[in-house]
Structure formats: structure tokens, C-alpha cells
């Protein structure tokens, strides 16, 4: 952590000395999980507190615990110079073959909504202030229904499918986050098949982002 803080402070100093002096907002993927021998978009950093994965938090059904985690992790992020966390993953784990299910709060939209709100408030506080760390809730409006469980970063996994006509179910945790002070969101990479007039990925889809 101290090496990260030194490096980010050095970079921040460079930014402050530019013509406009606009500071840099540094972000990171999750850093607090107990090591489990590899994974996708989740890392474990020595020297900071260790906690369960999101799926582990969901198993406790304890929103007070995840709120406390957010407060502690937020303080550790600020000490290193990070002001945005590229998490939580509020996708619903409805496709068992999807490789990122471990990073979600599970398949229950109501539970995921409750855990997401507690997570956001733990990191950010009830309102944004100097002690806040933004949470980038992802992947809007829900990355769980991957066709075949394939990776949407690749052409082979570009499609999101909704055989149960449950698009709105996947949206619920994100709506809860928006209603409770979420400030940053990451749109998803997949194409929501049959959901909009634009057959393009969610991050480029006018209906998904603005309508």
C-alpha cells in the first residue's frame, strides 16, 4: 500500500503542475478479497484488510456487515490515493456457466439490491464528501444473462438473452443503487437481444443509456 500511495502521489503532483492543474481520479478493481488462487477482475493486495467475495457477503445476508466493510475499505483506498472503486458487481447470477458469478451477490434481485445499497453507502457515505470513495456499480443494466455463459469481452460472447422475458428483473439492483445515491455506473459490453430497436452493445445503446 505505501508503494502505491507514493506512486499515486507522484502522478498527482504531475497533474497539479499542468496548466489547468486538474487532479487525477485513480480507480481500482477490488483489492480486499481473501486470496483464492486466481480469478477475473478481483485482486488481493497484501497489507490491507481481507474480506469475503461478494458472493460470500451475500451468503451472510448481513447488510450491516457489508456497510462496515465499505467504510473500512474506503479509508484504505483513500490512504493509497484511490477515489473510485470499479465495483460492486450488481449483475444477477442467472447463468450458471458464466465465469463471473463469484463476483456477484447471487441470483436474487431483492437481496442483490439490498447488498448493493449497503455497499455503496459504506464507500460513499449518505452524501458525497471529502471522505467518499465513489463506487462504479456494474455492469448496467445487468450482465448475468450471458448466452452460453460466454465472455462478452469477446465476439463469441456478445449476446445477452432473456428467455424468461426478465430484463427488468436484472435491472432491479441498479435501480436501487440509483435511488440511493449511486454516482458512477459502468455500462455492459453485451448486446441485449430483442430488447431494443438498436442491436448494439449496451454501452453504445441509446435506449439503454438515455431513454
Annotate each predicted stretch with a short phrase.
Residues 1-211:
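Glycoside hydrolase catalytic-domain context in secreted enzymes
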Amino acid at each position: 500500500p505505501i508503494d502505491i500511495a507514493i506512486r499515486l502521489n507522484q502522478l498527482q503532483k504531475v497533474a497539479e503542475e499542468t496548466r489547468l492543474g486538474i487532479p487525477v481520479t485513480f480507480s481500482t478493481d477490488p483489492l480486499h478479497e481473501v486470496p483464492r488462487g486466481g480469478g477475473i477482475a478481483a485482486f488481493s493486495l497484501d497489507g490491507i484488510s481481507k474480506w469475503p467475495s461478494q458472493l460470500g457477503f451475500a451468503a451472510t445476508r448481513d447488510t450491516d456487515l457489508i456497510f462496515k466493510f465499505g467504510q473500512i475499505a474506503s479509508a484504505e483506498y483513500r490512504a493509497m490515493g484511490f477515489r473510485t472503486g470499479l465495483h460492486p458487481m450488481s449483475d444477477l447470477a442467472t447463468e450458471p456457466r458464466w465465469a463471473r458469478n463469484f463476483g456477484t451477490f447471487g441470483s436474487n434481485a431483492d437481496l442483490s439490491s439490498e447488498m448493493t445499497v449497503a455497499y455503496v453507502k459504506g464507500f460513499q457515505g449518505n452524501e458525497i464528501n471529502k471522505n467518499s470513495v465513489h463506487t462504479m456499480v456494474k455492469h448496467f443494466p445487468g450482465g448475468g444473462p450471458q448466452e452460453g455463459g460466454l465472455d462478452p469481452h469477446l465476439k463469441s460472447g456478445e449476446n445477452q438473452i432473456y428467455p424468461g422475458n426478465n430484463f427488468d428483473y436484472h435491472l432491479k439492483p441498479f435501480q436501487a443503487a440509483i435511488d440511493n445515491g449511486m454516482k458512477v455506473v459502468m455500462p455492459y459490453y453485451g448486446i441485449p437481444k430483442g430488447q431494443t430497436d438498436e442491436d448494439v452493445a449496451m454501452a453504445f445503446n441509446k435506449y439503454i443509456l438515455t431513454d
